[in-house]
Swiss-Prot record:
Signal peptide: none annotated. NCBIfam families: ogt. It comes from the Archaea. The gene is ogt. GO terms for cellular component: cytoplasm. This is Methylated-DNA--protein-cysteine methyltransferase. The lineage of its organism: Archaea, Thermoproteota, Thermoprotei, Thermoproteales, Thermoproteaceae.
Amino acid sequence: MICSQYGPVVVGWDGSKTFVNPSRCSKRVGLAEFLELINIDEIDKRLLYLLGIPRGYVTTYKLYAEVLGTSPRHVGWLMARNPLPVILPCHRVVKSDFSLGGYTGGVEVKKKLLAYEGALCGDRPCRVVRPRMIDDVRDALFKSLGLA
């Protein structure tokens, strides 16, 4: 598995999906090189709205649902099936009461990621935006991870 560091976590890539804090890494690369391995064209387009949530901000399941025209519960289902956690930042989606909600890597990892990105005031998210569709996926991906 090829791995890269993003703030407090290691992200692993097995050729089809990413893993947060994988147990074994055969090779470590820089984050920019890691991103070049991923074919974003194969990703569910509804997940690309995640790239419209800037670093340091969060959105809620409800706001995300409004943009997609679906329910917050469906958004939770969609986030749970994100094949690229951290890369497509589903950790930036929180509950309407600003509690963190769930995360593939666990709530503590979600909290560490949000703190690393400057999205927390104390223990709670403090800057909320409505997700938006982006034009240039690659550019948004690099900006989302602080590489541009």
